């Protein structure tokens, strides 16, 4: 009976000591994986930030082009009313008093140069 107890005690001590070693090993392994995960997350975060900055630059570029085009479209064309005191004329147009049509409105219109 004593040999059974000694054998059981020996197996128990070995299991506990090896289990502790595995636990420490697992803890160290998890720390390494966590550190690797952090570096991967930092890399992914930087990559995402670069993509967002590129997208923002494209959107701002499109907005500036759109506003530039819309300004040109507002006064493009002949016969559009304008202000005689406002020097902002579109290229190729000049703000003049109408000769025949529109004289009853008492305003100036864009005409081609």
Curated annotation (Swiss-Prot):
Family annotation (InterPro entries): Toxin_22
Tissue specificity: Expressed by the venom gland.
Keywords in alphabetical order: Disulfide bond, Ion channel impairing toxin, Knottin, Secreted, Signal, Toxin
Protein localization: Secreted
Propeptide feature: residues: 22-74
Source organism superkingdom: Eukaryota
GO molecular function: sodium channel inhibitor activity; toxin activity
Signal peptide: 1-21
Disulfide pattern: 75-90, 82-95
Region (Disordered): 61-83
GO cellular component terms listed in the entry, alphabetical order: extracellular region
The keyword RNA-binding is assigned to this record: no
Family membership noted in the UniProt record: Belongs to the neurotoxin 14 (magi-1) family. 01 (HNTX-16) subfamily.
Function: Probable ion channel inhibitor.
Domain notes: The presence of a 'disulfide through disulfide knot' structurally defines this protein as a knottin.
Protein name (Swiss-Prot/TrEMBL): U11-theraphotoxin-Hhn1o
Organism whose genome encodes this protein: Cyriopagopus hainanus
């Amino acid at each position: 009976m004593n040999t059974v107890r000694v054998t059981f005690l020996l197996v128990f001590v070995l299991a506990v000591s090896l289990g502790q070693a595995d636990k420490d090993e697992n803890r160290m392994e998890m720390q390494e994986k966590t550190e690797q995960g952090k570096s991967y997350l930092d890399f992914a975060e930087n990559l995402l930030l670069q993509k967002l900055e590129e997208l923002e630059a494209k959107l701002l570029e499109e907005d500036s082009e759109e506003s530039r085009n819309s300004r040109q479209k507002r006064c493009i064309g002949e016969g559009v009313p304008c202000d005689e005191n406002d020097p902002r004329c579109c290229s190729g147009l000049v703000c003049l008093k109408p000769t025949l049509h529109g004289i009853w409105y008492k305003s100036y219109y864009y005409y081609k140069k």
